[in-house]
Amino acid sequence: MGQVVTFLQSLPEVINEAINIALIAISIICILKGLVNFWKCGVVQLAIFLCLAGRKCDGLMIDRRHELSHVELNLTRMFDNLPQSCSKNNTHHYYKGPKGTTWGIELTLTNTSLDSYANMSRIRSLAFGNITNCDKTGEAGHTLKWLLNELHFNVLHVTRHVGARCRVSEGAGLLIQYNLTIGDHGGEVGRHLIASLAQIIGDNKAAWVGKCDSHCTMDGKCNYTNCEGFTHYNYLIIQNTTWENHCSYSPMSTIRMALNKVAYSSVSRQLLGFFTWDISDSSGAHVPGGYCLEQWAIVWAGIKCFDNAVMAKCNKDHNVEFCDTMRLFDFNQNAIKTLQLNVENSVNLLKRSINGLISDSLVIRNSLKQLAKIPYCNYTKFWYVNDTITGKHSLPQCWLMRNGSYLNETHFKNEWLWESQNLYNEMLLKEYEDRQGKTPIALTDICFWSLVFFTSTVFLQLVGIPTHRHLVGEGCPKPHRITSNSLCACGYYKIPKRPTRWVRKGK
């Protein structure tokens, strides 16, 4: 340590010596070059790889500045007023009550009848959702009415089902049984009822496979086990239950049901409006320049912002799932919040407006892909290419699913490489347009024509234009200018008809 202090104290004297300065320069160059070589040799990269191997990465780096990122949307709050469905398995399906309630409705497909159970009677009327003699809970009325209307009437266009029975005991809770083997005047209503249920659930195969054994206690609670096998169901059991996160639910099934009437008819639609979003800071003040998803709208904590370029693409191209989802967010933020409607009016407003907000062809296309076991979109997770230097994003694309799980990044490598290339092209095009806007047109013209002039002169210089005549075998006649007869006007060259030739200047 003392040697270092002594060296620092004598540093001014050392620098005075030229040889010492040269040694210092060489030492610095060697150290810097050694560090560069050490970084390029791969030892540091190997150590980083071994430390991070097997751990989750925040993003997949495509190149030095582009990163593959994703955003996972939380659509549940958007449809607080609508029941949201999910499936635990092929036989147990659930509906969550609106506005964050802790109760729900359980739908179970089984081959075991409850007709022998006490206090079961035929439902008086299913017209307009009238189940007053069945609904003894006093809390599931709105959800159950919506379920019956959408599941039964809007799909089947009938007002009764002769095989429907319910429990009428006071305080015993909700218990409704559909006998799916009994036909109505319209034919196999029960089978169509199951198909309608499959539309809401989102998996057309789930409603047709398996069977369950029921175990009912004296207090009216039924448990269903051994849900397996390959047979058609005979009964649909509807009962109230507590909401304990039985399964992860998605509102896209509800959207599919809301689009049911439009989905199977040839109806041309136009987008209701363009995006009017802007960025908001932490205090809620609007800052023009893009759109930020609030914390409730995404699965992970924080704010995710997309610039105006992404929103402009959504205004231009309507055939993208991400843009449809953003329209739903925009509608939820502005329409329902501004109008401050009650629950039932909000449901009606959403059902009427949803056909102008999202593309029903996309919903149907993804439903068909799911049915055909082709990777499909569930409108929840979207990937995009992020420029880590400029902060620009590509238009997010849906992260496809297969068999209930998201595809690996390698399955759509060509897609995100293409988006990365498009992002580079857009950046270069924008820089070119910016430069064009800052450069005067006259200066551009001068530069262009000067380049043309320079190229022409180079060509002429290479060709070599002859400038004067020479007498063959003699020196340069300048300053005399010889005619074609080898004569000069001044009389210096007097012998006519001598052989001449054209030569360049300086020859």
Swiss-Prot record:
Domain of life of the organism encoding this protein: Viruses
Identify a single GO molecular function assigned to this protein: metal ion binding
Cellular compartments per GO CC:
host cell endoplasmic reticulum membrane; host cell Golgi membrane; host cell plasma membrane; membrane; viral envelope; virion membrane
The positions annotated as site (Important for GP-C-mediated membrane fusion) read 33
List residue numbers at the site (Cleavage): 58-59, 272-273
Which chain positions have N-myristoyl glycine-type lipid attachment?
2
Q: Residues that bind Zn(2+) 1, according to the entry?
A: 57, 480, 488, 490
Q: Where are the transmembrane segments?
A: 18-33, 446-466
Pfam families, per database record: Arena_glycoprot
Cytoplasmic side: which ranges?
A: 34-58, 467-507
Know the name of this protein? Pre-glycoprotein polyprotein GP complex
